[in-house]
UniProtKB/Swiss-Prot annotation:
The gene is ndhB1. It is an enzyme of class 7 (translocase). The lineage of its organism: Eukaryota, Viridiplantae, Streptophyta, Embryophyta, Tracheophyta. One of its GO terms (cellular component) is chloroplast thylakoid membrane. Disulfide bonds: none annotated. This is NAD(P)H-quinone oxidoreductase subunit 2 A, chloroplastic.
Length: 510
């Protein structure tokens, strides 16, 4: 009798444990509904691809786009909810993480229309391209909400693997293969360095992997000012530096930008920086809270090197994509200012605001490059000479996006930089802000050089590419032009829109 009672109690306890273990992921899964929509979209794409023919190609774009739009909608409906830590501490939802997830989804939503005509012209496989884009987006979203060292390592690897495959998507292109090999080798090395830094952090905290628990562990073990934390800081900074691509971790960027398909470059140029910025902000602000006197000077050096080298080397480039690669290195230097300033002086809000404008400016520029490349087959800056005489709309759109990237008033880029530099100045980063102002002037110089070429009417400067330029019918490139128009409008928003955007960004801070 006693044996039967004990046996029944054991069965009941086992059942409760099983139900609790089953209920936990099911309950937590309801809080990652935006990510779940993307996963469902991925499965649907695979199912349709395995049962359809080439006539169903428009459905692939529709499913991908609607999945991203629905994910954005679900994310907005979740706005203002209480912060939650899910999946036994692996994932955290709060407004700060969600605004970065929104930016990543926005990037992907704008990038897919840029790819439609390009993929058809280059005869690339469509389904795989969309699968890689959605999977990379999913990895970036999980990285934004990652709350422990394992997830912070696995999520960017998901993003990176898709990035490697996308950069080498044109397999017959030698430059694309070279770019992929460099990207893969540098990415593998940086991941090894990053996980080595995590091992120092894990050991110093007494075996903790959650970000907040690492802080508590460092306090308990009295290791928060130890040499081990300094070593971890250096290795983690180098590992994250590859994702952000500041100088001197920028060597892969120009080659990958030049060799990869242009829509892929547009996608990588914004999503990788948004996801890495979200991760870097949380890592530096939480586990290395007690080491701010060490990582502030370290990031200042990276920001100065990025702003100077990126903008100076961009002057000498002859390829539009290589020029934008070095320009992006300079741009990440400005973003680092916001990370250094932190929450105290509105640094995070200014960083988020500037990244929102940077997405529109950069994607608008790449949309123009994709259109010009499809119609002429060239990427050389000199071949843009006289474009205004053949296609004023495209030339003006490119000019507006470049001027906004340079930070000329009254365009959006000017007000984004102004707020970012003002927050840096209030935080006492006078030298860093001065370097930022100087390099912004330098960037305006090489952007104006390109705009001068666009507007020139002298026949001796116009190359055969523009002389034989034929504008495609409206129905042919309407998806690219739609993305371009949206980005150009967002890049030219006057400063009157800054206050509500900054207010929303400030409300998201943790």
């Amino acid at each position: 009798m006693i044996w039967h009672v004990q046996n029944e109690n054991l069965i009941l306890d086992s059942t409760r444990i099983f139900m609790k273990a089953f209920h936990l992921p099911l309950f937590d899964g309801s809080f990652i509904f935006p990510e779940g929509i993307l996963i469902f979209g991925l499965i649907l794409l695979l199912m349709i691809d395995s049962t359809s023919d080439q006539t169903d190609i428009p459905w692939f774009y529709f499913i991908s786009s609607i999945s991203l739009v629905m994910s954005i909608t679900a994310l907005l409906f979740r706005w203002r909810e209480e912060p939650r830590i899910l999946f036994s501490g692996n994932f955290q939802t709060n407004n700060f993480n969600e605004i970065f997830q929104f930016l990543i989804l926005l990037c992907s939503t704008l990038c897919i229309p840029l790819s439609v005509e390009y993929i058809e012209c280059t005869e690339m496989a469509i389904t795989e391209f969309l699968l890689f884009v959605l999977t990379a987006t999913l990895g970036g979203m999980f990285l934004c909400g990652a709350n422990d060292l394992i997830t912070i390592f696995v999520a960017p690897e998901c993003f990176s693997l898709c990035s490697y495959l996308l950069s080498g998507y044109t397999k017959k292109d030698v430059r694309s293969n070279e770019a992929t090999m460099k990207y893969l080798l540098m990415g593998g090395a940086s991941s090894s360095i990053l996980v080595h830094g995590f091992s120092w952090l894990y050991g110093s905290s007494g075996g903790e992997i959650e970000l907040q628990e690492i802080v508590n562990g460092l306090i308990n073990t009295q290791m928060y000012n130890s040499p081990g934390i300094s070593i971890a800081l250096i290795f983690i900074t180098v590992g994250i530096g590859f994702k952000l691509s500041p100088a001197p971790s920028h060597q892969w960027t120009p080659d990958v930008y030049e060799g990869s398909p242009t829509p892929v470059v547009a996608f990588l140029s914004v999503t990788s920086k948004v996801a890495a910025s979200a991760s870097a902000t949380r890592i530096f602000d939480i586990p290395f809270y007690f080491s701010s006197n060490e990582w502030h000077p370290l990031l200042e050096i990276l920001a100065i090197l990025s702003m100077i080298l990126g903008n100076l080397i961009a002057i000498t480039q002859t390829s539009m994509k290589r020029m934008l690669a070095y320009s992006s290195i300079g741009q990440i230097g400005y973003v680092i200012i916001g990370i250094i300033v932190g929450d105290a002086n509105g640094g995070y809000a200014s960083m988020i605001t500037y990244m929102l404008f940077y997405i529109s400016m950069n994607l608008g520029t790449f949309a123009c490059i994709v259109l010009f490349g499809l119609r002429t087959g060239t990427d050389n800056i000199r071949d843009y000479a006289g474009l205004y005489t053949k296609d004023p709309f495209l030339a003006l759109s490119l000019a507006l996006c470049l001027l906004s990237l340079g930070g000329l008033p009254p365009l959006a880029g000017f007000f984004g930089k102004l707020h970012l530099f003002w927050c840096g100045w209030q935080a006492g980063l006078y030298f860093l802000v001065s370097i930022g102002l100087f390099t912004s002037v330098v960037s305006i110089y090489y952007y104006l050089k390109i705009i001068k070429l666009l507007m020139t009417g002298r026949k001796q400067e116009i190359t055969p590419h523009v002389r034989n330029y034929r504008r495609s019918p409206l129905r042919s490139n309407n998806s690219i032009e739609l993305s371009m128009i949206v980005c150009v409008i967002a890049s030219t928003i006057p400063g009157i829109s800054m206050n509500p955007i900054i207010a929303i960004a400030q409300d998201t801070l943790f």
